[in-house]
Amino acid sequence: MINFQESVTFQDVAVDFTAEEWQLLDCTERTLYWDVMLENYRNLISVGCPINKTKVILKVEQGQEPWMVEGVNLHQSSPESDCPLVDEPRKHRESKDNFLKSVLLTFNKILTMERIHHYNMSTSLNPMRKKSCKSFEKRLPPHLDLLNYNRSYTGENAYECRECGKAFKKKFHFIRHEKNHTRKKPFECSDCGKAYSRKAHLVTHQKIHNGERPFVCNDCGKAFMHKAQLVVHQRLHTGEKPYECSQCGKTFTWNSSFNQHVKSHTLEKSFECEECGKTFRYSSSLYKHSRFHTGEKPYQCIICGKAFGNTSVLVTHQRIHTGEKPYGCIECGKAFIKKSHLLRHQITHTGEKPYECNRCGKAFSQKSNLIVHQKIHT
């Protein structure tokens, strides 16, 4: 066990500066000095360190300044009164910075000594507690509370996450960030039971149930649940094409069309089908594709006996028998067996037309409509 009383003295944690430096401190800094010195003294007494009161402590307890400033009365030197402001020469600014740094170091020393003392007392009463460091730390006074008080004087981020080390200036932002680690979702929808980590997300979700659509297009009157949906829809009226391909310069109205186009430049297709010439990026994709030519269907439905060329198609087919519709529209609640069916349905809400004719630029919401249109050009 560490001999705590022999290893710590008041001088180890005292904040020392000259009378000249004291005269340069402003009201807030002098008040902070009072708090620190008295707190140091009380903390050392509380952990059993025998300390003789120094002249500085006696003066501070009596409401006097450690160093008298010429021309200033005693009653003007208390923390509650207005401190005399002295012009601060540039060469003395470093002294004030060093003072604040020493305050922070002092608080850290006190905190460390208190933890050592409490740990020694705890383990002497119950030696088995040495094996449970984590559980012991949880019973200690919060480390952040004291440090955050100090950081408020230096402008540092006060609230630090113990999980990832990210720091925040505001407690509200810190609490919100912590939920990312704990996965807490306290905001639950009373209609469907779905939970969210933020109240704003719950409010947005509840618009599905009450049918609220506050964002209205000024051109055609169509209403939308989210502002982002309105912005995308308005491109139909303005003709805006914000997505430009850096490879060929072609522009697109919809992000989905743009992403699909970019793949034509970036995807390397090294596996070619000997039957139809279609290329694939992976050999496994080519192997699955070849079943269309051979007619091979190794995956059979156990309910109706229908066979399929790959497992994904079989799984989708079986939903016809089970009635499962896992893909639900957040706008109207309608559910679908296939994800592609959901995506096609959602276009009716957004007004998006991702299928664009290469000849004339006319866009369509359904690919089948584009195919029919292209026959005009051929």
Swiss-Prot record:
Coiled-coil positions are none
Q: What protein name does the entry list?
A: Zinc finger protein 684
Q: Please state the protein's primary subcellular location.
A: nucleus
List zinc finger spans: C2H2-type: 159-181, 187-209, 215-237, 243-265, 271-293, 299-321, 327-349, 355-377
* InterPro entries assigned: KRAB (IPR001909), KRAB_dom_sf (IPR036051), Znf_C2H2-type (IPR050758), Znf_C2H2_sf (IPR036236), Znf_C2H2_type (IPR013087)
Q: Give the UniProt record's GO annotations in the biological process aspect.
A: regulation of DNA-templated transcription
Compartments annotated for it: namely:
Nucleus
- Extract the Gene3D superfamilies matched here: 6.10.140.140, Classic Zinc Finger
Task: Return the similarity comment.
Answer: Belongs to the krueppel C2H2-type zinc-finger protein family.
Checking SUPFAM superfamilies in the record gives: beta-beta-alpha zinc fingers (SSF57667), KRAB domain (Kruppel-associated box) (SSF109640)
Please tell me the species this chain comes from.
Macaca fascicularis (Crab-eating macaque)
- Function of the molecule: May be involved in transcriptional regulation.
